[in-house]
Amino acid sequence: MSVGILGTKVGMTQFFDEAGLSIPVTVIQVGPCVITQIKAVSTDGYNAIQVGYKQVAEQKLNKPLLGHLKKSQAPPLKYLREYEMKSTDDFEVSQILSTDLFQVGQKINVSSRSVGKGFSGYQKRHHFSRGPMSHGSKNHRQPGSIGAGTTPGRVYPGKNMAGQLGNKKVTIKNLQIVSINSENDLLIVKGAVPGKPGALVKISK
């Protein structure tokens, strides 16, 4: 993984290119992020930079985290994430990362937590076909058989069944940057990004 940045999903809109074509895009408020720590092979076993994002009141953080941030003279930051890389020579503690890292046309990977749908059934969660709705059928939205009989005498792990839908980490790869607004720290990315408006977004090259 190469260097990246944290941000917040603003929402979706449309963007018109030079030919007048309408492109569905997601607007992401990125950074500015602060490098709070640089990890090295000699001390940590791998090379990485730790990035902090979204300043909050000191009361929101515990003392160990505040002490860690004071070492890098960083303000109280709500989110800390790491980006592992081959070399950290181009970075230093307290360095500010913003939209300058990216260029129009560049492909990026975007990770976020998908929208939670709660406890969902077989049709909504796994796209099962439903049963007959009439002629005396009592099997409208049931799964049908979930296994064999005495042998194996159990339901195999991983069987598609009803349960929690969404609210898990999702990564969309190779999203193209359509436009960059450096004044307002906005990235405009072609396509959809996981999560609700306001969700934390992790971006990497």
From Swiss-Prot:
InterPro entries: Ribosomal_uL3, Ribosomal_uL3_bac/org-type, Ribosomal_uL3_CS, Transl_B-barrel_sf. One of its GO terms (molecular function) is rRNA binding. Keywords: Chloroplast, Plastid, Ribonucleoprotein, Ribosomal protein, RNA-binding, rRNA-binding. One of its GO terms (cellular component) is chloroplast. PROSITE patterns: RIBOSOMAL_L3. Its main location: plastid. The keyword S-adenosyl-L-methionine does not apply. Residues 129-154 are annotated as: Disordered. GO terms for biological process: translation. The keyword Chloroplast applies. It is found in: Plastid, Chloroplast. Part of the 50S ribosomal subunit. Belongs to the universal ribosomal protein uL3 family. One of the primary rRNA binding proteins, it binds directly near the 3'-end of the 23S rRNA, where it nucleates assembly of the 50S subunit. PANTHER family: 50S RIBOSOMAL PROTEIN L3, LARGE RIBOSOMAL SUBUNIT PROTEIN UL3C. This is Large ribosomal subunit protein uL3c. The lineage of its organism: Eukaryota, Rhodophyta, Bangiophyceae, Bangiales, Bangiaceae.
